[in-house]
Amino acid sequence: MATYKGITFPDHVAPLARHMHSVDDHREALASLSGTWDTLALLAHLSNLKADMSEVRASFGQLTGELLVCLAEEMLKLADETLGHQAQIAVDVLTRNLFERTADIGFLATDAAIVDACAADDPAVFAALRERLRAYAARYTVYRDIVLMAPDGRVLTRLVDGFAGRSSSPIVGRALGDQGGYVETYEATDFCGAEPALTYAWRVEQNGHAVGVLALVFDLEREARMIFERLATHDEVLAFVDGQGRVVVSNDAARLPPGHRVGLRDGAASLRLGGVTHLVTQRRGQPYQGYPGPGWATVALAPVELAFGADAEGSVAVEFSGENVFSQRLLDVPVRAREIQRRLDRMVWNGRIHQAAESNAFSRSLLEEIAATGRRTKDVFERASSELLTTVAAGLLGEARFLADLSVDVLDRNLYERANDCRWWATSPVLATMDANAARKTLAHINGLYTVYANVLLFDAQGVVVAASRDTSVEGRQLTNAWVADCLKLRDPMRYAASPFEPSELYRGAGTYVYAAPILVDGSAVGGVALVFDSTPQFEAMLRAALPETAGSVAAFCRRDGAVISRTGELPVTLPASVLSLTAGQSWSGVLTEGGLSFVVGATAGSGYREFKTSDGYDEPVIGVVVIPCGQAVDRHVATAPQIANVPGGTEIATFLIGEHLLGVPAGDVIECIEVQAAVRVWRGGFAQRHVGFVTWNDMALPLVDIAADVNAAGAAQRHALVLKAGTQWFGLLVSELGPVADMKLTEERGLTGKGDITKLIAQLARSGSVFIPVLSADAIFGGPAG
C-alpha cells in the first residue's frame, strides 16, 4: 500500500493515481468538505448542540478513502481491459490469418505445374511458372514473395526479382526433412534478404521423392499495419513480440522499433518508454483449430496522460441492477453513501426538532449549515459513485463493441479466403479436364487441407455436378441456383460468384454461403468450382471466440433486415434501427431494455478485408452483435423533498416523504426520528392493518404504523420511523425519506373529500410560497380506520 495526497492506494494503483484527474477532482472536493465538517463539529460542540457528528464524520472519512480507491482501481481496470482487448484481438486475428497460410503452403506444394517444373528443371518452364505464381499472388494478396527452390537450395523461380543463387538457409533442410508438414520460421534468409521474414515452406514431392522446396513469404508488415490501424483509437502503441519479448513489428517504430526488447515484469502495470510513463499490457495468442501460432504476443501501451481520459461512453446512465456484472463492493459503495447521508439527515432533522421549542437562532443557523454541507457532501459522493458505476458500464460497452468488431472482422477475413480459394482452384489443369475420378481425388485432397468446407464441387457448363470431395451423392445433380448461372457467365478469372446466406440443399437444408468461380478454357467457361462453406460450426466458432465471460451473454451475426445468420443463443432483445442501419465499418454500443431486463449491446457492421467486399464487387453486409445481460432495469432516482423557505411567524412543520409524496406533521408532535433496521414485522388484517410491527425504543416495544397504501405508495421503501404520540400511546410512523423542518403557514383542510384514504388523516394544509403540504393528525394515523 502507498499513500498519495492522504489516500492509501494499493501499490499497483498508487503510481498511476496522479494521472486520474477525476479521482483527484473528487478527492479535492471531499478534502475541502472535510475541513468544513471539522469546523462545524467544533461549533456544534461549543454551542451544546444536541447533534453528535463524530460517527457520521468518521463514516464519511472511511467511505471517502474506499470510494476513491475503488474508483481508481476501476479506472485502471477499464484502461487495462481496453488495451487488453486490443492486444488479444490483434494476436488472435493474426493467428487465424496464419492458420490459413499453413493450408495454402500444403496445397500449393502439390500444384501440378509446380511439381512438373521441379521435375523438369528447365529454365523455360520456370519462366512460364512465374506467371502462374503471379496469378496465385493476385488472388492471395497476403504474400509478398513466393520462392521455388531445388533440393540443393538453388532458386528455380520466384515471384519478385531478388536472390537467384543457391540458398543455404536452414529452412530448406528443415522442409526437406519434414515429410508431409509445413515449416514456419521468422528469421532472416539469404533468399529474402537481411531482415527477418515470416516464411512458410513445404517440400515438393513427385512419386514420394523430394524434387523441390516451396516457400511462401507472408507480407507481415502490411498485415500488421492493417490490424493495428483498425484497433488503435487514440495514441496506443501496438506491437507483436516474440517469445523473448523482442519487437517483431509495431505501429510506432520510433517508440518500439523492431528488435527492441520490451522488459515487462510480472504484474507490471506501467512502463517507461522514451521518458514517458505508459500503461502497458500483454496478451498471448490462443491456438486456432490446432494451429498454435508463431508463439508471439501483442504488447499494447498507452501514455498514462491519455489512458485515463474521459470516455464518451462513460456517460451512459446506469439504469440496471448489475448484480451479475458489478462486484458486491461496487454495489455497496452508493448504498453506504446514501445510508450515511440518511444518518446525517436524521441527526439534523432531530436537531431541528429539539430546537423547535427554543429560540436559539445560532443553533438553528448552525443546523442549517450542517444540512447544507451534508447536501454538498451527498452531491460529491453521488457524482463519484455515479462515475464509479459508469466507469464499469463503459468497460462493458467497450467490451461488447470490441468483441462485436472482432467477430465480424474474423468473418470477413475468413470469407476472403473462400473467395480466393474458389478462384485459384478453378485454375487447376486437373479440374479443367472434367475427369470425374481425377477431379474427385483432387477435391478430396483440397478438402482435407481446407477443413472449413462441407463439400467442394466440380460442375460442368450445364451446371451438372461432375465430382464432389465428400458427399458424392450430389454427383450427376443439375444445379439450378442463381449463383451457378452467375458463375458460368463470368469471363474474368479474377471474378467469382456467391450465393446469399440462405438454406441450401447442398448443406442439408441449412443456411450457408456457396462461393463459385468459373473454369475458363480459351476464354469460355467449361464449368466451375463451388465451395460449400461449413457455416454452422465455423460461424459458431467465430462467435464463441467473441463471447464475453459474463454468463448469459449472446453473440450473433445478422443481416440488415434483422435476419439472424448465426447465434450462440436466443437474442434476448430486439435489435433497434441504430444497429440494423449501421454502414460498413460503423460501430454502436448502448443499453437496451426488454421485458424488465437490461442488456449492454455492442454491434459492428463488417467492412470487408483487403479487396474482399471493398473493391471486388461483392456486397453481402453482415453485422456482428454481442449482448451482455446486466440484470433488472431499475430507476436509480431517489425522491428528495424540495427546499422550503421559512414563513415568518409560521408554525414549524416536520416534513417527510412516503414514496414520492411530501407530507408533514407539526414539529411539536415529533419526539425524534429513529432507524427501523431492527424492526420486528408482523401482519394484521382488518382495522389494524396499518400496524405492521414493532421496534425497540427507550426500552419499550414501539408499535410501527405504515400508511403507504393510504397515499398510493404501497411498497415504498421505509427507512425511518417518526416517533409520535396519539393520546397516551407512543408509535412510530414509517417514512421513506426526511424533508426539511420549516416554518410554514397553516390553513384549514378544505375540498379534499373523496380523494382517497389520505384525506381521513389530514388535519390541515401547510403553505410556503407555491409549496402546499398536507399536515397529518397523529391520532388519525394511529387509530383511524384503514379504509
Give, region by region, the residue ranges found by the protein language model.
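Conserved secondary-structure micro-motifs at functional edges
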Residues: 645-776, 781-782
